[in-house]
Amino acid sequence: MIVDYQDVDTVISGVDYFSSYNGNIENENCKLSDLFEQNVNNQFFQPNNTSLPPPTNQQPQPQPQQWDLMEDENCNSSFENSPQQPTSPLLISSQTSYPSDLSSNSSISHSPIENQLLDNNLDINNYLNKINIFNNHFQNSDLINTTFFNQFENNNYINNNNNKENNSYFYNNNVNIPNNNNLNINNNNNNNNNNNNNNNNNNNNNNNNNNNNNNNNNNNNNNNNNKNTVYNNVNIPNNNNFNLNLSNNNNNLNLTNNNNNKNSVNNNNVNISNNNNNNNFNVNLSNNNVNISNIPISNYYQQAAQTIFDDNFQTIQFNKEYPLNEHISQSTNKRMKISHHSHSLSNNNENSLSQPYFNNNNNNNNENENVYNIVNEQNPTFNPNQSNTHQQQEEQYQQHEEGQEEKEHEEEEKYQKQKPKIEIEELININLIKEKIEKLKNKFENENVICSEFLEKCFKFSSFPIFPIVESKLKFYQFEIDFSFSSYIESQKLDKIGLPSFKRPVQFLNTFYTQEIVNLDQELITRSQPIHDFIECISLIRPLLSLSSSSSSSSSSSSPSSSNELNSKLNMVQSVFNVVKSYQKTNTANVILQVLKKYAKEFKSRRILSEQQETNMNLWFDAHVNNPYPEEDEKVILGAVNNLSKSQIDNWFGNKRMRDKSNKKSL
C-alpha cells in the first residue's frame, strides 16, 4: 500500500492520543515516516488513497508529539501493554476543523465512532472537544488501559437491576496495573441502619480479568437502602492476594464475622473480626490498630468483654501516636458507655444484632454462650434478651453521671475538712520574711539603679566598633602631629607662588581637606565618650561584684586600675584616627605636587629636606636598625609629622637603601 507521508503527518500532527503516553522514543534517529511505513497495517492508521481534505484554517500544524512506543534496533514499533488496541476515533486531528458538510457517504474512511456520529448528523468538532477533555484528564498518567477507551466510546453506566426501584446508581471503574496479583476493596456506606455483613463467599482474585465478577458479587451483598454506592476495584501489584472489606457505619456498632477474610477494618467504629480457621483475631479501634494473635478463643472473649464493657465505665484508651479526631472519639466513647450501662441488643426485626458480639452461626454457638456467661458475671443486671429504647438508655446514663458527680463532691468536702490548719506562728514567720525582703530591696536600690545603667550603656557601647585590630598602630598615639595643611605649604615654600592657576586648585583642596579633618575629630569625640561612660560603670559595678562595701566603691572610681584601663582604650582609638588623618594629609600633598608640575613648571625644583626634617628621619632610621624600612602606616605618620608627601618619603627611604649598600661594599 502506498502511503502519502505528508498527508499522514497532517492527520497525525494534532492527535492528542499520543500525548497521553509519557514515554520517549528510544531511537531518536528513527524518522516519523519510517514508523508509519512499517506500521501501515496497524488498525490505528488505515488511510485510503484519497487523503483527508485540507483543514479550513490555514495555520501551521504543530509537530507530532512523542508517544510511548517500544522500538527495536530496526525501528519496529509496538504499543506497550496493548496487545489489541481498539479502533480509536482519535485518528482525526484535534487541532484542525473540517467542513460541516461531511456525511457518511463520503469517500473518506472513518472509525466506527465517526461513522456513528455522521449517521446521527452529529458535529464532529463537538466530539473532538470531548476527546480533548478525555485526553487532558488522563495526560501524564500511566494508568491507561483499553477499558477506559471502551467505556468512553460506549458511554454507558452499569446499572444494577435490583436497585432501580430505589433510584440507585453504580459506577464500575477498573484500573489495571501490570501485575498478576490484586487487591479488591469493597466500600459499603450505611448511614442509617445497623449493617450485619456475613461474607462467607468472598474469594481472593488471582487474575486481573476478574474485576467485573467481583463487582457483581459485591453488589448482591448490598442492602436495598443504600441509594448511592460506588464500587471501585483497584488491582495493585502484591505478592499475597487478599480481600479487604471496608464498612462505614456512622450511627451504630458494626460487628462483622468473615470466615475467609484475613483482615477486617472498620473506620470510625469499633470492629471485632473473628477468624475461625486460624484462631487469630484483629481488634481495630477506628484508625488505631491493636493486633492480637495466637490467643485461645476463651481468652479472646474475656478480653473483648473487658475491653468493651467495663464495670467502672472506663472508656478505651486510644493510642496517642495516632489520635482520633474529637468527633469520632466522643461519639465512640458515648456509644460504648451507653452499651455498657444498658447492655441492650434488639432482635433482627428491629434492624439490630441478633447476638451481643457475633452472628448466629452453628460453629460459634458454644463460643457465644461463653460470652453470655462472662458478661453476666461482670454485671448481673445484663440480659441479652432485654431491649430498651434509646430514651431509657439516655436516662440511665444521666442518672449514673449525676451519681458520679455527687460522689466527687462528697469526697472533695471530706478532703477540705481534713486539711491541717496553718498555725499562727507560721504566719508570723512568713510576715517577718516579707519584711526582711523589703528591707533588702530598699538597701540595694541604689545598686540596682547602677546595674541597670551599666547594662544600658553596655548596649549602647556595643553599637560602636571602638576596638578594631590596632595592635600595630598602638604606638602612633604618642606622635604630636600638626594636621593643618598650611604647615605643609609653608615648609615646602609653596606660599610664594602667586600664579592664579596654581592658587585656585590649592585653595580648593585645602577647603575639602580641612572639612575632612573636622569630621574625623568629631568622630573621635563621639567614639571616645562611650569609653568614658563604660569605664565609669565598670568602676562602679566592680565593688558590687567583689562584695565590697559601699564606701570603698566611691574611692575605687579613681583607682589606678580604672584610670590605666581608660587610658589604654583611648590611646588605641587615638592611634587609629592619627593614621587615618595622616593618610589624608600625605595624599593631599601628593595632589599639590601634581598641580605644581602642571601649572607652575618654572617653580618646580629638587625638593631638599630641611635640617629638622633630615634629623627626624635619621633618628627614626637609627631607632629601627633591625627593621629600618617602615610599613605604609609608618610612612604616612612620618610624612605627617615632618610635612612631607608620600612620594617624598618613598624617595628618601629608597635613597637611604642605596647609600647603605654602597657603604657596605666600601667597607
Curated annotation (Swiss-Prot):
Pfam family, one: Homeobox_KN
GO CC terms, sorted: nucleus
Name listed for the protein in its UniProt record: Homeobox protein 3
Gene designation per UniProt: hbx3
Bias (Pro residues) ranges: 52-63
DNA-binding residues (ranges): 602-664
Polar residues: bias regions: 75-96, 380-390
Induction: Up-regulated by phagocytic stimuli.
